[in-house]
Amino acid sequence: MNRFAKLLEKLMFTPSRNAKIVAMAEYFENTPDPDRGFALGAITRDLSLNNLKPTQLRTLTKSRVDPELFDMSYDYVGDMAETISLIWPKHTNHILEKQRLPQLGELISALQTKSKIALQTYVTELLDCASVTERWAIIKMVTGGLRVGVSARLAKTSLAEFSSKDLTEIEKIWHCLLYTSDAADES
């Protein structure tokens, strides 16, 4: 999850098209399956996940921090994921701090299978043991708001770069790609 969060941060704040292609190609090269496929699906917004509504996240956060502080922070920052990731209290339980975040595939599987109530509890536990960047990525994933400045065409270009395949070959099979945990389980 940490590597994926860093990739999202890089993609979000890198204006250069070529630098984004290199960042994605490096991620794909250094990430095992099925996580690289899930990352591709998440970046291109082709994943279907159970989402938390912004009001649910707002309520969840206000149960952890002063509601007025949250409202003022959100008003100032303007982005809910960024506000929550910055304002979420650092957990004082050292056991939670050392708790491992799930791999991207594990996170996606949980997001696809958990009920709305179980999802809220799960997200709370994740946010408690995550860094600021990881919290931001988790919130973007659970709200379905993963817009990081990457089009499907740019993702295809990075795949061509990573795989040393021609872009037209990638485009020919693109419509056949399936980003579900079922597909990962079959391999």
Stretches with model-predicted labels:
Residues 182-187:
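A short, hydrophobic C-terminal helix/tail in secreted or cell-surface proteins
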Residues 1-181:
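N-terminal nucleic-acid-engaging modules of covalent nucleotidyltransferase systems
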